[in-house]
């Protein structure tokens, strides 16, 4: 039995509610949040919520708790019959016209975390204004009394309710796979491809022990594309890594590609995070290809294929996107970090945004979903390689008429709350010693503290919205300058 609902304050971060399993992320918390969602949806035209979950400790059981609370509150529930990526849930919500989606995941966070995030009927992250309303409901003083006494039983093999049984299980995977194959037109790309290229093409998949296990491989198998997988067994401990597709977490994938690339320039690796909405890539030489470069390749391809309208990026994304948009006369919006801010523009009536992306590996294509999708983006990259006959580095060189021109870096600092607050106060008051202050061209405070320089370099100092961290970002056209910007900020922080 779930214990009585507790009046503990629940606050949502950049992308939902996250916490340490058994500490602040509990069955009680999941039930309270889910019951609050039901209350928020009571006047919705649709009365169905889809629930998905990743491969983390107790994710299946937390999903069952969410489903139980929703059904007990009068909501129809469709529960995934297996773990699934976040974008797979998002597609199901949009395709089946659900009122909302609930995803149990902590995305790229370490193994001890879990989380819950909401999906809108558009298949996007729920808008911040809506999440704030749910947060207000869940923390209302009379909420516990109103919901106390609703019987919920959480079973490892299913659900049982004392008040009703208005739910079903569904396979979320099948329709999603069909959709991404149709949208990428991978079948046409493969059938029209150079035969020697197809023989050379080899893909290594790293789902990082997460919810993307089995998705890319099922598509590649269908088209007889040579592939292999690493870290592809469910292991909630994420041994040896955090499930975030960044350079420092992909040693095994890079090593695998380095060996293959000696003989094959069309070897490529794709990694997805814990819930497979983010992507990282590795080239044939074993070099990490970050999200800025992936964003650049896909954006350039879509523009050349005739896409028009606008693009949206978060404040921490590379200036390379500005350069591509300027070159092709494409409008560009810059928004706070969090894909929900990109989704808000993608789903706004009358808006012409066809693509959006963030620094952390989340890229969304409006014709698919107003949502980041690491699996779809991996297939889109693969299609671009097949159609162009070029590998990732050749594609990048073609975009900029030179090797990728920017050096980008991010460093995460663990700061106690006191030092973090002192830093923020100094930044707000203007007393923080900004590096190369005399060369500043602009400042931008829409999310954190961003400073742009006359030579195009920039610096961003921002507290994380999902973790107890301070993040420092910098970019310039020279690695020593990028590193210098970060080091000067660290020196100033250490003096606090």
Locate each region found by the language model.
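Buried hydrophobic positions in well-ordered alpha/beta secondary-structure cores of metabolic enzymes
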Residues: 15, 51, 89, 102, ...
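An N-terminal, well-structured beta->alpha segment
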Residues: 1-73, 99-100, 160-203
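Proline/glycine-rich low-complexity loops and linkers
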Residues: 81, 133-177, 284-357, 363-365
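Phosphate-binding and adjacent anionic-ligand microenvironments
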Residues: 268, 307-496
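Gly/Ser/Thr-enriched, mixed-charge loops and adjacent short helices
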Residues: 2-7, 114-262
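Short glycine-centered, acidic/aromatic-flanked micro-motifs in structured strand/loop junctions
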Residues: 52-55, 205-207, 283, 367, ...
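N-terminal small/polar loop signature for handling phosphorylated ligands or for N-terminal nucleophile
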Residues: 39, 48-113, 218-282
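Glycine-rich phosphate-binding loop
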Residues: 99-113, 257-283, 288, 332-334, ...
